[in-house]
Amino acid sequence: MAQGQRKFQAHKPAKSKTAAAASEKNRGPRKGGRVIAPKKARVVQQQKLKKNLEVGIRKKIEHDVVMKASSSLPKKLALLKAPAKKKGAAAATSSKTPS
C-alpha cells in the first residue's frame, strides 16, 4: 500500500471564459443596495455633503454614548482603537515608551 499523499491530484477541467460569464449571469440578484454614481456635479456635491453629515452624526452619537457610559461607571472606560496601518505602525511603536 502506498504511503503519503498522491503526488498528482485530480483536477476538474477549467471552465471556459464564456461558461464562467454565463454562470455569473445565472447566479441571480445579489443582496444589498446598489449605489449608482451620479454624473451631475451638483448631485455629486449633495451626496458628499450627505455622507459627511451622516458620519458626523454617527460620531457624535457614539461619543455621547461613551461619555454617558463612562460617567456612570466607577472605573474609567478604556477605548479600543483600530490597529494602525503598516507605515504608521513602525513609527507608533518606536515612539511609545513602556509603562
Swiss-Prot record:
Lineage at the top is: Eukaryota, Metazoa, Chordata, Craniata, Vertebrata
Provide the family line: Belongs to the UPF0390 family.
Which parts form a coiled-coil structure per UniProt? none
Question: Which residues lie within the region annotated Disordered?
Answer: 1-36
Highest taxon listed in the record's lineage: Eukaryota
Name of the molecule in the record? Leydig cell tumor 10 kDa protein homolog
Organism encoding this protein: Homo sapiens
Q: What does this protein do?
A: May have a potential role in hypercalcemia of malignancy.
Q: Which residues cross the membrane?
A: none
